Amino acid sequence: MADADRDAIAELVHRYADAVVHYDGDQWGACWDVDAHWVLGPGRDVTGRAAIVELWFKAMKMFSAVVQNVLNGEVRVDGDAASGRWYIMEHFRRANDERGILLAFYEDTYVRRDGRWFFASRQLHIQYQGPPDLSGPFQNDWSGR
């Protein structure tokens, strides 16, 4: 894989997070391919850029502030298609003033069109969502193994 492809996909992921922080639907929507697929969670699974942006605005109404940080990630490129996994951490304040943190990762596929990378699909996998002190349950708790 060319470093330029990985860098361009990393920039896409960071542009997405920046749009979340600034509540910028135009910037956020421009990250998606026209026929993309987004799985935000059970019952929140949509296809097509317009439907994806509509779901995003509905989801964002639950919050008054979000800071999304992109952590580590990996990318595998195969021509004009690629896949990857990116870990994120979000600090948020809900509309009811409840504060919390989200630790999760996205499983992604990407497509290159006219020399530019877009999300072809993103699926959110929540590892933790709860109080900032991490006192809530972890979805990936392996302590019983």
Model regions and ranges:
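Basic/polar N-terminal segments that are highly enriched at the extreme N-terminus
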Residues: 1-7, 141-145
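Hydrophobic (often cysteine-bearing) scaffold residues that line and stabilize catalytic clefts
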Residues: 5, 9, 48, 102
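A beta-strand edge to alpha-helix "cap/lid" segment located at domain peripheries
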Residues: 57-145
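Short, aromatic-enriched amphipathic alpha-helices that serve as compact interaction elements
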Residues: 5-21
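Surface-exposed helix-capping loop/turn segments at secondary-structure junctions
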Residues: 22-27, 116
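Residue-level recognition of hydrophobic positions within alpha-helical transmembrane segments
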Residues: 1-3, 20, 103-105
